[in-house]
Amino acid sequence: MNTIRFTALSVLLSFGIFLEANNSGLISMSKNYSADSCMVYNPDITLIQNKDINVEADLLSFDENNAVSLKNNVLIDFPGGSLSSSEALISENKNLIQFEKDTKLSLENFFLQGQKGSFIRSSNNIEIQDGSIFLPFRGLKVNFSQLNGSLDNDLNFKDAIISSCMNPSDGWLIGANEVGLNNETYRGYAKNITLKIKGISVFKAPYMPFATTNERLSGFLEPTLSSSSDGVDFSVPYFAILSDHSDITLALRNIAERGSGIELNYRYIKEHTKNNIDAFYFNSDKKMQKNFPEQTNSRWAYKIQDSLMLNNSSGMNWGEIVINWGEASDAMVLRDIPGEITSVGMQRDHYLNQNVKIHSSFKNFQISLEHQGYQTLNPLLTNGYKKSPSINVNFSKRINSVNIKHKLNITNFEANNLHEFFGASSSMGKYLAIIEDPIEGRRTYSDLTFSKQFIKNIFNIDASIGLKSLSYDLNSHKLANNNIHSPNAIINVSSIFLKNNKNGFSSIQPRLLIGFSQYKDQAGNPVFDSDLVSYNNQVFENNRFSGMDRISDEANHSIGFAYKVNKYNRDVLKFTFAKKYTHSDNKVYLSNPNMVNPHKKKFIMSSMWMPNMNNSLKIYGGFDNKDDKLHIGGINFLTKSSLGTLGVAKRYRRMAGNFRQTLNYSEIYTSINIRDGFKIIGKFQHDNEYDVKIQSMIGLEYENCCIALRIIGSDKNLTRYNDLYNSSYTYINDAWDNMINIENKSRINFEFELKGFSASVNKLDRMLQDSLLNY
């Protein structure tokens, strides 16, 4: 082959020197099944610093207009791109390039192929027949019979085939009579389309819009489709960008057995502000009206989550306003209508928060003002107490080597009505369904502490003394409450022994805690927000109660140690053991003296083994020597390999919740890689105490680099209420026994994703949120 290199062509046309380029291998294939695109663009664009172009060809000639004709093995390099072809013609001003046969045009953001056409460099106008274009931003390839337009704005295609698959017959393709792309708005449309998957036509439409970039764009999102015990559930979401900092998603939704409604998600994010609003509204609910004819109202729910940093003009932060407020039309709406694009709450949530908090810091002070309330999602229970307002003032200062801390809380408690709960039952095991005139009033709590830390030989010693105070100002109740002041003291002694090993270290940390808190009679004081601290959190604490309605009486000591092995800056083994000895019987209780914690010798242990990032085992438990019973325990086992993932979890608590019920749950989760992108996913939760299924989920997923298909079936046992508004029961226990049974709620979700063309929200993430492996 006689290759002519025009190193002297600058005398005639100022083309400059030749730079070798290579058009082979510009598009490579991704072999990862979960990749976002099958094709990866590797542009080989010669970096030319001026406006000249460089050419190479077997044959060269000039016509009467001084245009350069090139034939055989043509290669043209120019600023921002390169072109290879069998034949090409370059105009005298080097602006127009015409080409024929086996042409490849490589640009920074596009790769084009074709049999005949032209390209104007100054305007990026292009015409091609029988070719293709690759859009690297989405990994899309468009074959066409004819293309014309400008690469800077509008492109028009005739007889187009769109796909992100190297072999569309094994994946997906969309055939269209006409396709338009706008490279300024990054939007496109297709007319008279046919969608084929694995060569089978599955969908036809006269018109379909789509995006040509991964950036945020307004427009319709992929519809969602599922089938449940409430019939077919179908929604069409629309996403709109309101500004650089905000967007909104609206979805029209229809549930066959319930009716039509709308969902909304609004987001606003800026440097000092984060706002999220989720809401849905159904004007009526056919199934609700059938089961409860007296209820004909609309059903809705919303949740507002907002945070605003309070900054002055100089940028100094004065504090923050935080809002977490949710409300629902009725207690059962989230159970009956789970969100599709919204996250107001989950089907098993017990309440919605209704909180507003303002807090600030000034030198040694932290101050907050708060409203805290709830809406119950259990129709048998009331909304409980509201804290409005609740004022917190925290002071901390170090004087010489002494740390001084003072916490002051003043809270007003209000309630229209109240149900009884643990610590406030009328008789053993019986809880009033309604207290029409509950105790209300203001509570003042103070905690003053002086502490000092010092090192004695190999021991770290933290010693503190303090005074806790509690007083009440109750409204219209002649309750013999006691204003109390209780001194307390804590000595915490610890040490650490290190041994350096190859690639890491091991350590042992022994610990001793001695605690004392003087007994004060609090039998007449109300219980607004307190409960027993969970068993495993009592060992190294000098308090048995959460909240501020009780000051615990304590005379105890706890001993324990923690052993740890660290390799490559990662903990591979942990083991902790602790035991608490109570030296005298506790006399402070909530409201029932029979519920005083009897455990005088309790111990807890926990361990974690994680030899590598793919395998882990975690175990914890709490045991009492006096009754020889396990009070709390849990196991997590997780392993990953090329075959898939397996997780096993177990949770046990002897007394949990307001009614002190035994919780005994287990779960198995698995994700099995079958072959060539196929995967089976399953999750099964079981209540071992009552031997009933809680929830099961199984799904089949196929994914390769251009398509993802998922079919997910879920099955839940949820509480069903025979009469939502029956108030004839005196005790919650009786209402629970007579009004509640179990209802099975099943659902099948269908998901698909045409990679590069569409995007699908993987609902598996939401379905796995309540996995025991997360707790």
Q: Where do the protein language model's features map onto the residues?
A:
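Structural signature for solvent-exposed beta-strand/loop edge elements and short helix-capping sites
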Residues: 22-354, 656-659, 675-682, 688-692, ...
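Outer-membrane beta-barrel translocator/pore domains, especially the C-terminal barrels
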Residues: 115, 125-127, 148, 154, ...
